[in-house]
Design a protein with these regions (language model features):
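Extracytoplasmic/secreted envelope proteins and their assembly/folding machinery
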Residues: 85, 124-132, 147-151, 155, ...
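N-terminal post-signal-peptidase region of extra-cytosolic proteins
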Residues: 55, 67, 71-76, 84-88, ...
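Second-shell loop/turn segments in exported
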Residues: 75-76, 113-121, 136-141, 195-205, ...
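Flexible, polar/acidic helix-loop-strand segments at domain edges
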Residues: 155-232
């Protein structure tokens, strides 16, 4: 496959990457809400969500430099710590483009490790170091999303309606086959729960489907022409701070909205593709090098 075809293929919509872009839309919503919600409430939201990630490389966003963001979606599935998604994004004002590079978390990388294994032993710091070593790039910002608390965002944004392929019971809730309506955080959490050891793939699919519906809610909010009530935005901001930890400060967020807004809206995706080796998913060194080259171009 030549590079032109490779680039075109990688720009196709990818579920996990589309889900991850929720966070960037939320940042825009949170700051744009300043005109309607009390300034201190928004500032407090970012203060609550703020977490220092000491291994990151500092950058002056006011100079409109290209910056990188490591986005990690994690949670507990059947009492086990699980990394659901790992994405490195570059946001470039010169090209007005944000490029997402997706790492398959269950695949063995050229260093003979999987992201899930690294997360289980070394947490977010382990993923950070692994991505940095694989790509040999500086990481400026980190966004950590707690999948288990995603239900609070679903509730705050009005709930979701979706198709459930198989009936099951979880945590006191009955989910029938067909259309299901999830309105509360507890309902969402129960729906995403892994029922038993045979339910891992299905539970991850349910998490992805919930995420896609939540993405739709956020998109509608981002395009609303009429502002809602004070409490409506306050609940969204609270859910944001409950679900997300990041070293993007309130001042960073304001600068990003003012200087990088167009770049955040124009996105492309790079996916590391896997091959099957003895029943296991593997990312080859050739594949990593090829995608790494494309990502490096997004930084220039």
């Amino acid at each position: 496959m030549n590079q032109k075809k490779r680039r075109h293929y990688r720009k196709k919509k990818h579920t996990v990457l589309k889900v991850i872009s929720i966070i960037f839309v939320l940042v825009i919503i949170a700051v744009a809400s300043i005109a309607y919600v009390a300034y201190r409430n928004v500032e407090s939201t970012f203060s609550t969500s703020y977490e220092n990630f000491p291994k990151t490389t500092s950058i002056d966003l006011k100079k409109s430099k290209t910056f990188t963001t490591l986005i990690i979606a994690t949670g507990k599935n059947n009492s086990k710590n699980t990394a659901y998604a790992t994405v490195l994004a570059s946001t470039n004002v010169k090209t007005n483009q944000t490029t997402f590079m997706n790492f398959p978390v269950f695949a063995t990388m050229p260093n003979q490790k999987t992201i899930t294994e690294v997360y289980n032993t070394n947490g977010d710091d382990g993923i950070f170091q692994m991505v940095k070593d694989l790509l040999n790039v500086s990481i400026n910002k980190v966004i950590q999303i707690d999948v288990n608390k995603m239900g609070s965002l679903v509730q705050a944004t009005g709930g979701i309606t979706m198709q459930n392929p198989k009936a099951f019971n979880a945590e006191g809730y009955e989910f029938k086959q067909g259309t299901v309506n999830l309105q509360t955080a507890d309902q969402v959490q129960a729906y995403m729960t892994q029922i038993d050891d045979t339910d891992l793939d299905a539970s991850i699919t349910r998490i992805q489907n919930v995420s896609m519906e939540l993405y739709g809610n956020i998109q509608k909010i981002a395009h609303m022409k009429k502002l809602e009530s004070f409490n409506y935005y306050r609940e969204i901001l609270y859910a944001f701070s409950n679900t997300v930890k990041t070293n993007i400060s309130f001042n960073d967020a304001k600068t990003i909205v003012m200087s990088y807004n167009t770049a955040l809206k124009n996105t492309s995706k790079l996916n590391l593709h896997t091959t099957d080796e003895n029943g296991a998913k593997v990312v080859s060194q050739t594949e990593l090098d090829s995608v790494k080259t494309l990502f490096e171009k997004s930084l220039k």
